[in-house]
Amino acid sequence: DNLPLEEEFDWVDKVSINLTTQMLATLFDFPFEERSKLTYWSDIAASSPEMTGGDVNTEERVAGLTECLETFTRIWHERKGREGGFDLISLLQRDPHTADMVDRPMEFLGNLCLLIVGGNDTTRNSATGGVLALNQNPAEYDKLRADPGLIPNMVSEIIRWQTPLAHMRRTATRDLEFQGQQIK
């Protein structure tokens, strides 16, 4: 609703990040007014020097991840014993394999980071890459506008075209030919 009309804007900032943050807040039943913390925690969780190859402010990273753990530990205790609830924290509490996960803080934080980074990065990257691909291929965009029934296939194709996890690669374990293409 708040997108500018007839003027340029930053798609990643205005749509991709906002959309994924709203989705994550809904999945966690996280306070909506604090949802930007989810994006921040995702970004710092994925910013290890091992993953980025660059410099990382370790103190900021530790402080941010500590805040994430403390926030979700508080949420866990607030929801404990509550009936129903289909948010991810409530589901973890009800599953016998994860019901005591909060008592293992590093495991709890690790699982939170997997869920947050997985939900944030994959959706943000796919949505952004999809819009970029449609802008670079206007004939394909015209096909979608003419036939919205193509959209379900478009989603799968965007995920294939623009890998959701830019740092995840596939490595061939042996040379082979696949659909006429050499893979080494």
Predicted regions and their residues:
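Cytochrome P450
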Residues: D1-K184
